[in-house]
UniProtKB/Swiss-Prot annotation:
Superkingdom of source: Bacteria
This protein's name: Holliday junction branch migration complex subunit RuvB
Major subcellular site: cytoplasm
InterPro entries in UniProt: AAA+_ATPase (IPR003593), AAA_lid_4 (IPR041445), DNA_helicase_Holl-junc_RuvB (IPR004605), P-loop_NTPase (IPR027417), RuvB-like_N (IPR008824), RuvB_C (IPR008823), WH-like_DNA-bd_sf (IPR036388), WH_DNA-bd_sf (IPR036390)
Binding site for ATP: I21, R22, G63, K66, T67, T68, E129, D130, F131, R172, Y182, R219
NCBIfam families membership: PRK00080.1, ruvB
Binding-site positions, Mg(2+): T67
EC number annotated for this UniProt entry: 3.6.4.-
Cellular compartments annotated: Cytoplasm
A GO BP annotation: DNA repair
Ranges where the record places region Small ATPAse domain (RuvB-S): 183-253
Length: 346
């Protein structure tokens, strides 16, 4: 399987690391059992028919394995994969070039597909449904449309904000799956597997400690493993033991629930500066010095999952659990005010 990255700048060391530990087969993919079981059936059926797999929409918080699964889909279907992202496809011509270069059975992976410009998104409709695109030649009175056939392909779209997808685009995906956060025991398995690939030992106790603070996210678990490896190597150790793991986590200011400095800053701001909320995300972003999109896509999902934050029509509100933990006692009364128990994101 050939992997082609298109207009996706990334750190070379990060790419090499991801390639080292990324599973290449469905059997090696840990977690998301119902999702992968269904995909096995869909892929097998498509191969029996000799068809391209239906287009696949993968949604969920970042770092749960959407890109990895897109690569596995291409591998299982015996095709190549071309990787790009919504913001990079700023012109319809860029998308047309990609589509016409695909061969039968190839996978086009578009990350952050919810950020596709409207004109480019509309260009996808006929490609997804009829495997054709219409290209305009010339301009003005002499302009004419030329229809080009493209090879049957599979579009895999990934999004952290499925609610921003338009209905016409969403309806064209034959397969739609959502990723869930991972339980600690599965993250521990991922850490043990990755440590073997990286050539560093890790004790079960250390792996469990790292897994428990990884916010249910494999990408974070692997990142913490890399940092623990750094501490182990500086200590001239070939094994990450419990002491090294704890030193790593303490140095990175990651607490027993996986909250980092920015998580705590967000909650402290809501609880103590805005009296528990509600507060608009734009005001919150200015207060903590972070981008609004980053708060919504990176920090909020886990804070909601952990039971500290609730989204309401009026803004973000701290839950009772958050008030108990983060209140400084300056005017916050956990028995009064617009407080919420832990609630899922809306």
């Amino acid at each position: 399987m050939k992997i082609e990255l298109l207009n996706t700048p990334a750190d070379a060391l990060e790419i090499r690391y991801e390639e080292q530990i990324r599973p290449l087969k469905m059997d090696d993919f840990t977690g998301q059992q119902r999702l992968t079981d269904n995909l096995r059936v869909f892929i097998s059926a498509a191969k029996i028919r000799g068809d391209a797999l239906d287009h696949v929409l993968l949604s969920g918080p970042p770092g749960l394995g959407k890109t990895t699964l897109a690569n596995i889909i291409a591998s299982e279907m015996g095709g190549n994969i071309k990787v790009t992202s919504g913001p990079m496809l700023d012109k319809a011509g860029n998308l047309a070039g990609l589509l016409t270069s695909l061969r039968k059975g190839d996978v086009l992976f578009i990350d952050e597909i919810h950020r596709l410009p409207a004109a480019v998104e509309e260009y996808l409709y006929s490609a997804m449904e009829d495997f054709r695109i219409d290209i305009m030649l010339d301009s003005g009175p002499s302009a004419r449309a030329v229809q080009l056939r493209i090879e049957p392909f599979t579009l895999v779209g990934a999004t952290t904000r499925s609610g921003l997808l338009t209905s016409p685009l969403r309806a064209r995906f034959g397969i739609s799956s959502r990723f869930d956060y991972y339980p600690p025991e599965l993250l521990e398995r991922i850490i043990l597997r990755a440590s073997g690939i990286l050539g560093i030992g890790v004790t079960t106790e250390a792996a469990g400690e790292i897994a428990g603070r990884s916010r249910g996210t494999p990408r974070i678990a692997n990142r913490l493993l890399r940092r623990a490896r750094d501490f182990a190597q500086v200590a001239d150790s070939f094994v990450i033991n419990h002491d090294i793991a704890m030193t790593t986590l303490a140095s990175l200011e990651i607490d027993e629930e996986g909250l980092d400095d920015m998580d705590k800053k967000i909650m402290d701001t809501i609880v103590n500066k805005f009296n528990g909320g509600p507060v608009g995300v734009a005001s919150l972003a200015v207060s903590v010095g972070e981008e609004q999109d980053t708060i919504e896509e990176v920090y909020e999902p886990y804070l909601i999952q952990a039971g500290y934050l609730a989204r309401t029509p009026r803004g973000r509100v701290a839950t009772r659990l958050a008030l108990k933990r983060f209140s400084s006692g300056s005017g916050i009364n956990s028995s009064e005010g617009p407080l919420f128990d832990a609630a899922p994101a809306r």
